[in-house]
Each structure stands twice: as structure tokens, then as C-alpha cells.
Amino acid sequence: MRTYYLAGNWKMNTTPAEGVELAGGIADQVKGSEHRVMVAPPFTSLSAVGEALRSKGSNIRLGAQNMSSEETGAHTGEVSVRMLESLGVGTVILGHSERRLIYGETNEFINKKVQLALTKGLEVILCVGETLEERDAGNVEKGVADQLEGCLSGVGKDTIGSVVIAYEPVWAIGTGKTATPEDAEAVHKFIREKVETLYG
């Protein structure tokens, strides 16, 4: 039986109190599930949500929505990997389309975060996906391949097992277009083949 990974990115939603309530409800719903579950609340709710999950004896993983590319220093507004570790975070989402499109994060910049997270023992959920322009131009595979190659540069066979690839059909977000299961499966297949090519 295939094991699924259910990841919840809460984005800029929930106060700590709301996060505790939501996490508790999720923990009750997935108790005893064979599937892997992760929740990524806002930074301000990580501590409270993590404590709530631990108090319930839940095996839900605590994730962060982002992290700094630097370990320490004068980086106003950033959150370091060490800070995340201290809160019990085991997973970090990197390369999300909103980080790429709104904040201008490049493959090279994301790669720096990926390598740092893996070095510190965190699991990485790496988001990839083609834009509407790339899809309309017939460059779906090239767009996704460029992201995979750029974001995974320098990641070795010994750590690639700690990377989960998440496909985001960016072209279907806010465009009125819909990504069908067939659309997603075609890209999933390509991603599996590309990772196999890169890592054998």
C-alpha cells in the first residue's frame, strides 16, 4: 500500500491560540493513520503548536514555511535553522511559488537554503512547478527540470532521501485554469524520472 504525505501549509493564518485548536483537531482526525502528516503554521505559532502536538502524543511533524539562507547574523526579520530546531521543527518548506513570485527567490537562492537545511538534518519539502507562460510555450518539462537541477545542485545521494518534491501547478493558481489529475500525474511522472536520472 502506498503511503501518502499530507502536508498542511497554513500560510499567514492562525494566531497561536487558533493554531493550537486547529492542530488538536487535526491530531484527533489522523490518529492511527499510516500516512505521514505535517503541519506548517506561521513562525509565531510554531512553539504553541509544537507543544500542543507533543502533549497529545501526536506523530504529526512540525514544519516551517520558510527559513533564512544564513545561519546567524544581521538579517532583520529572518528566522534561522537553529531557531527552528530549538522549536522542534523537523521539516521546512522551500521554493514555494509565493516565495519565488512575490519575493523573487531564485533557484540559486533556494538551493542555498536546501543545502543548509539538509546539513542540519531537516527534511525539506521542495516546491516546483511551471508558470502559465512556460506551459503555454510547451516548456513544462524544461521549467520543472531547471528548478530541480538548480535547487538540488550539490545535494548528494546521501541526503536526497530527506527531500520531498511537491508539485505546484503555478499556471493554475489565480488564472481561472484548472489542473486535472492527468495534468498533475504527467508532471509527477516527469519529476520521478528526472530525480532518477540525477541520482540513479
Give names to the regions the model predicted.
Residues 1-200:
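Active-site loop-to-helix "anion-binding N-cap" substructures in soluble metabolic enzymes
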